[in-house]
């Protein structure tokens, strides 16, 4: 009798413990970027984690895996497959999962961060990310600034597209970036990020392109003599979530997570723009010859590169998608500048 009662009590406690465990949600979040821990993106992620855990009264725990589960491509794949619950990724890899997302890599799509922010929060972007969710099971919670990309090299100042001719330039492993470099007359060499510094040090390539914050944080300035702030492509970060997992959460928890993701975006946006200016000045002080390209020079780069990349992306994502992206970017520009 006693043994029966003991077993019954143990079973009751186990069930109660199970119910308590089910009440608390543990979410796995990973970052596939190489940003410094004090970078705007990283500060935004910390703000998001703290907000979600505080607002849920500890019922949601966010476990951070920082650069331990691969780069953006790997963490995006993990979110798609459900190995990760959510993650920060960048728009340059999403074209591998949903081809229309390649269209955001068009050179000189945005004249400023303010226009890009307007675009990211606009109706068209909501439609694009919703289409991606339906096609892939990857839900987008928020978009934020990754930054404008600039050119560095070890051979000469780059003021116009003609200065690019003959340079061997490292690119991401992306056909869009290869098309961009080739349109300027440079020899594009796709190299994985971990091998970039060795390639620059040994002159396998003459230069590379990246956000100023990356050039500073990764110490690329130590092996490059020249930098051109030509802001040729704007990079976006996205907080993505496995759609099935998100739908399994309570409405209250969904709302808190969405709010946290938006807090990340607002925090990152305000910090990223400042960080880029500070990094550029630090690079100059470190001895690199920095040229800030004029609007006239940027227009030369746009004319030389944009159509070639647009034509390539149209073969991948469709001309109608490219036309819609260009129209939405123009709409965002008018919303900011009023003309």
Label every PLM stretch briefly.
Residues 15-21:
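Sec/Tat signal peptide C-region and signal peptidase I cleavage site
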Residues 7-15:
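Hydrophobic helical h-region of N-terminal Sec-dependent signal peptides
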Residues 1-6:
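Bacterial N-terminal signal peptides that target proteins for export
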Residues 22-115, 124, 130-339:
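N-terminal secretory/targeting leader peptides
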